[in-house]
Amino acid sequence: MYAQHLRKWSLKTKKQLMPLILLIISYMLLLNTCVLSSSATTQQQQQQQQQQQHLPRLWEGSAEESSYYIPLSSDNGSGSSESSAESGSSSSRSSSNNIDNNILSRLLSLNSNSLSSRSNVKLKPATVFDAGSSTPAQQEQHVAAVPEQQQQQQQQQQSMQKVPNTLINSQIYNLLYNGMPSEAASSKMRRHIQPSQLPHQPESRAQLPSNYSSRPAVRSYLIESYEMPESMLEDRSPEQAARSRRDGSNTNGSRQQQRTGHRQQLQQDKRDHRRQRQDQQKEQRQQQQQRQHKSGNKHQQQQQQRRKHQRKHQRYNRYCSARDPAQLAFAAPTVFQGVFKSMSADRRVNFSATMKVEKVYKQQHDLQLPTLVRLQFALSNSSGECDIYRERLMPRGMLRSGNDLQQASDISYMMFVQQTNPGNFTILGQPMRVTHLVVEAVETAVSENYTQNAEVTKIFSKPSKAIIKHGKKLRIVCEVSGQPPPKVTWFKDEKSINRKRNIYQFKHHKRRSELIVRSFNSSSDAGRYECRAKNKASKAIAKRRIMIKASPVHFPTDRSASGIPCNFDYCFHNGTCRMIPDINEVYCRCPTEYFGNRCENKWPDSRYFVAIYGQIHTLNNDY
């Protein structure tokens, strides 16, 4: 509009007056700009005065304390000072003031030993300088005390110089998150964190020895076993014993209360126990596969030889009463020795054979044994029964192969049969080739003074009164006597455990039986075990009981004086490594400045920084 009026008026005036008119117009415009600038400066001065008046209200007693210096990085100081000079709007400063006030109110409300009250919090004025260009001597000069007049002058000068916003935010995050800004600050804040404040991260992991396990320490138990006397067991009536076996109830009330009270703990122990058994089974399968892979054809040849000569390759840790000549001779009504005279040509499935009786060791009273006996046999893939109590008289004798019987005059066999009529026989067990030991066992078994009732002579546990680790094996041995050799069955808490092959392992020998707990667990495997023995001499059952108690072993909690020095590098920052051999555990004794399992973390500094209103202050902890 000025230009339009000037153009219209210039057309009417003379050309000599034009320079004077332009000078007057420029002078008027200059006056308007001066008035606007003066009003802006007055507003800025008023805001600065309000800020200086507001500082003593928030923090009391700050002028009495000595000043501290805060080193700033050269990059942040230079770049942020230029940006602060360019941005000078009053709205941005007012919003930043509100944010800083909120942060300070949060700091005062923290529940800690160092920030519990305002008396412990001391705000100290500080001087801002460039850390990159200063020397240690210059830093010491800044730390010196400053008179009150010089402090006021420095505050006025610092108020004109604005601290970069990124530095303020980084120092506030440093205070809020206990001196560990890298864990809580955003990626934008991490760019302004000094490298010295970052937590130390080890470059490489120490190499542990081959015998060290990284898994947590295994629990251990003190095993105590004692045999229960018969007086403690005869108090119960037979009806109560039968009811407890049928219902599965536990007469020990304290144990039942303990189970109901710690049901969740028992379930967790059972899950751990099951998991350990599964891991052990996997390891056993892998070991078996490795052994089979190494053996190769040699293992296959051994298997073929065992199939052809089964009796020669029986397992030594297993006693089969159904293959004991004494057991068969005592159980069979008729026992004789003979040779095969003829056999069927086709012996693939079923065949018959004629035997000539050479010697009779035992015979039925009502029937006379003929000289030639016709017997029937059948082939079976199974090796037959191992328990004499499960062995039955069969019309056909079971054989693994037709080649097991040889037709020769110098090869005799011992037969255990029952004569149903003069021409028919049932066979007990398998034909047994005659040797000196077989003849001696049969002659002893058919004698009149052979029988002896079964008896349990001793029962004990291995180990006893010793420490066993969780998941290891526990053995319970039961020694028996009697003729014929007794059969042993195992019970736990009045319940049979003979079918629990996944939890227990049984090794039956001629005069003793071993119960092996595959993976011992105190909650499920501790209790009362019973060994019962019987034989065919009488119906009486001999029994003995043993109580297994497992008490958890507690190692000393003060590990500063326990353990032996490690022979490998495990701890960081000059930490001392110690090892406890009993539980295979490694721990570190850290210096005062570090903490953690391997001394990998550093304690935060006791000084915290607060940056607000263009100034940087220090918040100290009084310990």
UniProtKB/Swiss-Prot annotation:
Disulfide bonds join C478-C531, C566-C577, C571-C588, C590-C599. GO terms for biological process: brain development; cell projection assembly; epidermal growth factor receptor signaling pathway; ERBB signaling pathway; haltere development; imaginal disc-derived wing morphogenesis; imaginal disc-derived wing vein morphogenesis; intracellular signal transduction. Residues 70-98, 130-162, 184-214, 229-317 are annotated as: Disordered. Keywords: Developmental protein, Disulfide bond, EGF-like domain, Glycoprotein, Growth factor, Immunoglobulin domain, Secreted, Signal. It holds the Pfam family Vein_beta-barrel. Residues 457-542 form the Ig-like C2-type domain. Residues 305-316 have a biased composition (Basic residues). InterPro entries: EGF-like_dom, Ig-like_dom, Ig-like_dom_sf, Ig-like_fold, Ig_I-set, Ig_sub2. Ligand for the EGF receptor. Seems to play a role in the global proliferation of wing disc cells and the larval patterning. Shows a strong synergistic genetic interaction with spi, suggesting a molecular interdependence. Required for the development of interveins cells. This is Protein vein. It comes from Drosophila melanogaster. The lineage of its organism: Eukaryota, Metazoa, Ecdysozoa, Arthropoda, Hexapoda. The gene is vn.
